[in-house]
């Protein structure tokens, strides 16, 4: 998509008076291969991704909206390593709060997907006997120390809306960085 937009811009700009180029090429690389300084405030880099840890306790929908305002998404744990890195970061800060993720089964009860990328939730970090859709109303996934005896962060399903026991902090994940190079021959 980004490459198409850049190419479209160059084509349109090529018709502007005094801005005609004979030849150009674009190249898009994942990440920041030249370690350019990029201000990612308020995001925090953990491994190769950037996150914001929302401090207000809100329902899942408000958490999603807050992340979108930052042009990011609720966190999606694509690997167990990513989950473990976030859990380690929170533990290092002494933060045992519960946090919303993008996971839910709003589309089909019992089948949990990451809302951000439409992939099945496959990581094995559920709390014991979870997800359970207690009362037929738990559809959004959060992470936290789920039970009083829990010794680590785990996943659990909770009601998405303003249920008194379902107002949590949230974690936003920035989109993956891409570096766009444009070479123009005049």
From Swiss-Prot:
GO biological process: calcium-dependent cell-cell adhesion via plasma membrane cell adhesion molecules; encapsulation of foreign target; immune response; melanization defense response
Disulfide partners: 140-160
Residues bearing glycans: 35, 47
Cited InterPro entries: C-type_lectin-like, C-type_lectin-like/link_sf, C-type_lectin/snaclec_domain, CTDL_fold
Pfam families: Lectin_C (PF00059)
Compartment(s) of residence: Secreted
Gene3D superfamilies xref list: Mannose-Binding Protein A, subunit A
GO molecular function: carbohydrate binding; galactose binding; metal ion binding; pattern recognition receptor activity
Signal peptide: 1-20
Keywords linked to the UniProt accession: Calcium, Disulfide bond, Glycoprotein, Hemagglutinin, Lectin, Metal-binding, Secreted, Signal
GO cellular component terms attached to this protein's record: external side of plasma membrane; extracellular region
PROSITE patterns registered for this protein in UniProt: C_TYPE_LECTIN_2 (PS50041)
CDD domains for the chain: CLECT
Main location group: secreted
Chain ranges of the C-type lectin domain: 46-169
Function: Galactose-specific lectin that displays calcium-dependent activity. Binds to the surface of hemocytes and enhances hemocyte encapsulation and melanization. This is likely by interacting with carbohydrates on the surface of the hemocytes. Also displays agglutination activity against the Gram-negative bacterium E.coli.
This protein's name: C-type lectin 37Da
Gene that produces this protein: lectin-37Da
